[in-house]
Amino acid sequence: MNTSRFIKCVTVGDGAVGKTCMLISYTSNTFPTDYVPTVFDNFSANVVVDGSTVNLGLWDTAGQEDYNRLRPLSYRGADVFLLAFSLISRASYENVHKKWIPELRHYAPNVPIVLVGTKLDLRDDKQFLSDNPGAISITTSQGEELKKMIGAVTYIECSSKTQQNVKAVFDVAIKIALRPPKPKRKPIKRRSCAFL
């Protein structure tokens, strides 16, 4: 009997960056058109990666401040985090290191992080950018820079609407959870003892 390993994957990030859309796009190959703020939700699916079947538990969390005390309850037992920001929102990009990294490092310090830039289809959409003058595009190099700054394992950009790279986000997360990176060891300080 082949027992599949359970992997808990938790999505975090500001409200309205597309976390729920990314999960729905991945699990049902559809794109929801109505925005409904998430309080908490989860999905489960059996997935085959590199010939191994895993039971992937997807935990969707609310990014709104109203849920700051409730959200960390979903972090317990996480194998990997998908930390999402919108590629058309400078505020969500900045909150990755201002809000989300401190929260994740406090509640789940050793869990690997996949940094995800969402809404890739809108980054170069001239009509959208014209209609939304407050939208500021985040470049791939800025995402890579942020990945290094926060110590994420990898960075990937996706579009839930077009499904570009959505499967890749979850494939990478599963592979990281199955073979998490070894934590960097702090150098051991040698203490010496001197007798006088």
Curated annotation (Swiss-Prot):
Its source organism is Gossypium hirsutum
GO CC annotations, alphabetized: cell projection; cytoplasmic vesicle; cytoskeleton; plasma membrane
Q: Domain of life here? A: Eukaryota
Does the record carry Ion transport as a key word?
Answer: no
Q: Which Gene3D superfamilies match?
A: P-loop containing nucleotide triphosphate hydrolases (3.40.50.300)
The UniProt keywords, alphabetically, are:
Cytoplasm, GTP-binding, Lipoprotein, Membrane, Methylation, Nucleotide-binding, Prenylation
The region annotated as signal peptide is: none
A single Gene Ontology molecular function, please?
GTP binding
- The protein's name is Rac-like GTP-binding protein RAC9
Q: Which SUPFAM superfamilies match?
A: P-loop containing nucleoside triphosphate hydrolases (SSF52540)
- Record flagged with keyword RNA-binding: no
